[in-house]
Amino acid sequence: MEFKHYSVLRDETIENLNIRPDGIYVDGTLGGAGHSYEIAKRLSDKGRLIGIDQDADAIKAAGERLAEFGDRVTIVRSNYSDMKNVLHSLGIEKVDGIMLDLGVSSFQLDTPKRGFTYRSEDAPLDMRMDDRNALTARDIVNTYSENDLYRIIRDYGEDKFAKNIAKHIVAARQKQEITTTGELNEIIKAAIPQKVRATGGHPSKRTYQAIRIELNHELDVLRDNLDDMIDLLNPGGRICIITFHSLEDRIVKSNFKKNENPCTCPPSFPVCVCGNKSKGTVITRKPILPSEKELEENSRSKSAKLRVFEKNDL
């Protein structure tokens, strides 16, 4: 199956990266290389693009798609959390732009055996972005305590029926192991009142999101590495991040704001004495959203938000 990933907010991201032909750029979530292709074709022979992804299918597809650019492009199978080490191994200390597209790819959603989608009834409960990891969604569903299931569905899925869903999962697995998306869907459906199911979208959506985030440590990786990525930027360099739900967006918004104004002095102080220096400027006071045209062409873009931060000239 061809690796597909509609490049959400592609033109807006490319425009905000301010690409210089001889610059060095990093795509930390390479996917199908839709964004990376647009970056690479704007580079001269002196420019470089480093693409990072933990998904083996993405690495293969991106390698084929970007082959025409030759040595201009380097692809590395890793998590963007290891960006600094990846760049160091390539002899690169600073870059001119970084982008992250935090969405699950269309390929991942549309390949049932990957277990990301609740729309398939007989897929295995997998959800690993990196299949080298041992833990799967099946392990979480069948081994986490009721309290831990409740916690992740509440915190990562923001589902008001989290407690009941966790209770139903634990009750069901005591009879037999839960192994497929279809089995999990039926359990979740039974835990949500019928009148809510009729109007609230697919009942499994929030629980699947919660399990996926927990399994792949998505929020921890984002939260723990934003500061380091900003530090990797040259003066005037930009980081562009596309998020797909409020949990991610809040982390990015808060981090960019903190790096723009890190002062911890009380408001009553006439001058700053804490010594914390601004690293740059938030370019997007409000996030950039998909155009009407994009929303018509790709319904999966509807929750996307792009935020941009520019490193200070030191």
Swiss-Prot record:
Keyword Membrane among record annotations: no
Claim: Methyltransferase is one of the keywords in the record: yes
Leading EC class: transferase
Highest classification ranks of the organism: Bacteria, Bacillati, Bacillota, Clostridia, Lachnospirales
Record protein name field: Ribosomal RNA small subunit methyltransferase H 2
Keywords, alphabetical: Cytoplasm, Methyltransferase, rRNA processing, S-adenosyl-L-methionine, Transferase
Region of interest (Disordered), residue spans: 293-314
GO biological process, one term: rRNA base methylation
Location in the cell: Cytoplasm
E.C. number: 2.1.1.199
Alphabetical list of HAMAP family matching this protein: 16SrRNA_methyltr_H
Main function: Specifically methylates the N4 position of cytidine in position 1402 (C1402) of 16S rRNA.
Annotated GO CC locations: cytoplasm
Region forming the signal peptide: none
Domain of life: Bacteria
